[in-house]
Amino acid sequence: MTPVAVTGMGIAAPNGLGRPTTGRPPWAPRAASAASTRFDPSGYPAQLAGEIPGFRAAEHLPGRLVPQTDRVTRLSLAAADWALADAGVEVAAFDPLDMGVVTASHAGGFEFGQDELQKLLGQGQPVLSAYQSFAWFYAVNSGQISIRHGMKGPSGVVVSDQAGGLDALAQARRLVRKGTPLIVCGAVEPRSAPGAGSPSSPAGGMSDSDEPNRAYLPFDRDGRGYVPGGGRGVVPPLERAEAAPARGAEVYGEAGPLARLPAPHSGRGSTRAHAIRTALDDAGTAPGDIRRVFADGGGRYPNDRAEAEAISEVFGPGRVPVTCPRTMTGRLHSGAAPLDVACALLAMRAGVIPPTVHIDPCPEYDLDLVLYQVRPAALRTALGGARGHGGFNSALVVRAGQ
């Protein structure tokens, strides 16, 4: 098996922005959820959101790109810049065909598209912007990153709801193992326009609470759903583990195989548990080797119970530390799991387990939840999970760098 290394990070999340060395760690125990500021949420079920403060696109991107792109694409471009700089990648040293991009998104550039349609239909603007033809598209982030950095190798986009970020990392890993030297990957979602969240509203998963510290309570008997978050989890370059030291790059860790099960009812017991077991088997890792689990944290009883049962089924009740740092950011949709991966690798380097905040855990779940503050732990292996609407279940093993 060819090891695949994570060599850089560019984080754009409600509680962190930039390279890992430029700010506080993404597990800093604070809530980033607050009332939506980029639109009036009063007519929508979810009143709160995790928004990214302080990002000014003009400080990071050429002026010509700003009017052509949605805000999430600008975040994607900036995060890719940060990740490549963090990895010490000089793109000029690579053949363009040796570099690719894989991202995930389920909504695309919704704010740009919605603004243009409102101008056309409600404000008398006679035509749409020419940039509408691509700015709204869910694949635009892969395209714009590849254009900006001249990356002409294998590329793509993954659409699998909340599981998309892990699926994008897995696809990038496959491409590296097949011979592409460098793949930039990650996931991004908008939360800055009503249309971005509206498709999720009928599913009933979002919290209607207006209390930031009580709105998103996974594994809590008072859980009312999740708080949506906007932004990009992380854009890590992936490359062969042996190639990174050869060019003097620092390795954050290794991305292991991913198990992805799209069928919600496979006839093989718990689909989530089966995804976890498959990821462990493919990584050559025993359940006892996993020292922390980053939970998906749906925030409602049926989802939380199913996830807790799957974790206990594989690892044993209360046998492995479990955390859900998404309680500090909201669920970033497909961007959430890549942020978990970044958080896991940085936390393993720091010798801690990030906390779950605000919750009063329900004893029924029988989980060893890491609560309120970081827990010191010299651990080297973690598992992340994600579940999307329609039964997408993904699990990924990550290991600390040597």
UniProtKB/Swiss-Prot annotation:
UniProt record, GO biological process: antibiotic biosynthetic process; fatty acid biosynthetic process
A Pfam short name: Ketoacyl-synt_C
Functional pathway: Antifungal biosynthesis; monensin biosynthesis
EC number of this enzyme: 2.3.1.-
Signal peptide: none
Keywords: Acyltransferase, Antibiotic biosynthesis, Transferase
InterPro entries in UniProt: Beta-ketoacyl_synthase, Ketoacyl_synth_C, Ketoacyl_synth_N, PKS_Beta-ketoAc_synthase_dom, Thiolase-like
Keyword Flavoprotein: no
Record domain Ketosynthase family 3 (KS3): where: 1-400
A GO molecular-function descriptor: 3-oxoacyl-[acyl-carrier-protein] synthase activity
Biased composition (Low complexity): 192-205
SUPFAM superfamilies for this protein: Thiolase-like
Region (Disordered): 1-30, 188-222
Enzyme class: transferase
Family: Belongs to the thiolase-like superfamily. Beta-ketoacyl-ACP synthases family.
Note: This putative ketoacyl synthase lacks the active site cysteine.
PANTHER family: POLYKETIDE BETA-KETOACYL SYNTHASE 2-RELATED, POLYKETIDE SYNTHASE-RELATED
Protein name in the entry: Putative polyketide beta-ketoacyl synthase 2
